């Protein structure tokens, strides 16, 4: 059947080409193709133009989105680098602050130790003074007791009276 349209004849022994244009309908097929091209050209042309316009619009929108995305990406990179700079500054400030705090604590500790040493030295000095004073008082008390006991043993009433009179005379002379 297909071969009939093209003008081929099937015989038992050979294939023959039918050159009669009217029998093979080649003219009709050719006319049909021309009509389809003429009428379909507008229809297919409009479809293809619409499709082309949609593709071009999609490409433009994609390019615009790409540009916007690239701009946002660059902004994000700039923000990231700014954030990294700020983070590095914060780290450096933290190191400096830690060093300053450490130095301050060491100075304060040294000052506290010096103050404690001074307080301890003062306490020891004052304690020594009190102990010396107590020792002197005890020595004086013991000396007085010893002198009193010696005087009681060696002095009689007349000598005691003379000493008292001399002491009173000296006091009266001083008071005048």
From Swiss-Prot:
UniProt-annotated location(s)? Plastid, Chloroplast thylakoid membrane
The reply to whether Nucleotide-binding figures as a keyword in the UniProt entry is yes
What membrane topology term does the record carry? Single-pass membrane protein
Query: Which cellular component, as a GO term, is one annotated location?
Result: chloroplast thylakoid membrane
Q: Which GO terms describe its molecular function?
A: ATP binding; proton-transporting ATP synthase activity, rotational mechanism
Which residue ranges run through the membrane?
A: 19-39
Which InterPro entries does the annotation name?
ATP_synth_b/b'su_bac/chlpt
Q: Which UniProt keywords apply?
A: ATP synthesis, ATP-binding, CF(0), Chloroplast, Hydrogen ion transport, Ion transport, Membrane, Nucleotide-binding, Plastid, Thylakoid, Transmembrane, Transmembrane helix, Transport
- Superkingdom, taxonomy of origin: Eukaryota
Q: Does the keyword ATP-binding apply?
A: yes
SUBUNIT field:
F-type ATPases have 2 components, F(1) - the catalytic core - and F(0) - the membrane proton channel. F(1) has five subunits: alpha(3), beta(3), gamma(1), delta(1), epsilon(1). F(0) has four main subunits: a(1), b(1), b'(1) and c(10-14). The alpha and beta chains form an alternating ring which encloses part of the gamma chain. F(1) is attached to F(0) by a central stalk formed by the gamma and epsilon chains, while a peripheral stalk is formed by the delta, b and b' chains.
Q: Which PANTHER family match?
A: ATP SYNTHASE SUBUNIT B, CHLOROPLASTIC
- Similarity comment: family membership: Belongs to the ATPase B chain family.
Q: Give the miscellaneous note.
A: In plastids the F-type ATPase is also known as CF(1)CF(0).
Q: Briefly, what is this protein's role?
A: F(1)F(0) ATP synthase produces ATP from ADP in the presence of a proton or sodium gradient. F-type ATPases consist of two structural domains, F(1) containing the extramembraneous catalytic core and F(0) containing the membrane proton channel, linked together by a central stalk and a peripheral stalk. During catalysis, ATP synthesis in the catalytic domain of F(1) is coupled via a rotary mechanism of the central stalk subunits to proton translocation. Component of the F(0) channel, it forms part of the peripheral stalk, linking F(1) to F(0).
By what name is this protein known?
Answer: ATP synthase subunit b, chloroplastic
Q: Which source organism?
A: Galdieria sulphuraria
């Amino acid at each position: 059947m297909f071969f009939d349209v093209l003008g081929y004849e099937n015989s038992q022994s050979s294939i023959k080409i039918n050159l009669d244009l009217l029998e093979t309908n080649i003219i009709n097929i050719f006319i049909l193709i021309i009509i389809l091209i003429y009428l379909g050209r507008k229809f297919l042309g409009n479809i293809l133009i619409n499709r082309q316009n949609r593709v071009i619009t999609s490409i433009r929108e994609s390019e615009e989105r790409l540009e916007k995305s690239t701009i946002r990406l660059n902004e994000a990179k700039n923000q990231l680098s700014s954030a990294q700079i700020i983070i590095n500054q914060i780290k450096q400030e933290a190191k400096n602050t830690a060093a300053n705090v450490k130095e301050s604590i060491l100075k304060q500790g040294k000052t506290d130790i010096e103050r404690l040493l001074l307080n301890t030295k003062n306490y020891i000095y004052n304690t020594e003074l009190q102990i010396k004073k107590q020792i002197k008082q005890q020595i004086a008390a013991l000396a007085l007791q010893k002198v009193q006991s010696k005087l009681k043993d060696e002095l009689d009433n007349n000598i005691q009276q003379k000493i008292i009179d001399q002491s009173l005379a000296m006091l009266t002379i001083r008071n005048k």
